[in-house]
Amino acid sequence: MTYLGSGGPAGSLTDYYPSWLDNLADNVTIEGSAMDGVAQGAEAVRTILVAIRTLYESQKFNFVGPVGGNGLLEDYTAQVRGEPISCFVLITSNPAGQAQHIVANYRPRSSLLLLSRLVGEKLTGTPYREHFAAGES
């Protein structure tokens, strides 16, 4: 896996792809500040992450690097409907090297609430909808 960088010229992350997305454990879990509760299973996690990524107008990784013996930390910024959003993601792997647990912490609050509502709208009709904010009335 190629990673490590600060986003600067010497450690550019412009071509970084989070390869852990292609290596999810069957019972992987995801939780975070834009969600209520925890979603479990590769299909659930993949569906949620695809929904989130389709809402990003841009995404710039500032840092990607190992944490402990089985973790990976990503720090990135993006835009959702013109609003800036930043995120720290901690990915913990199982002994087989598969992503086992994902925690995402978004900021600022106004942007994370917007993201949560938009993800909820995208996931309407799925069992994962309940984890995200309700749309505006």
Model region roles, listed by residue range:
Residues 1-137:
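C-terminal and inter-domain tail/linker signature
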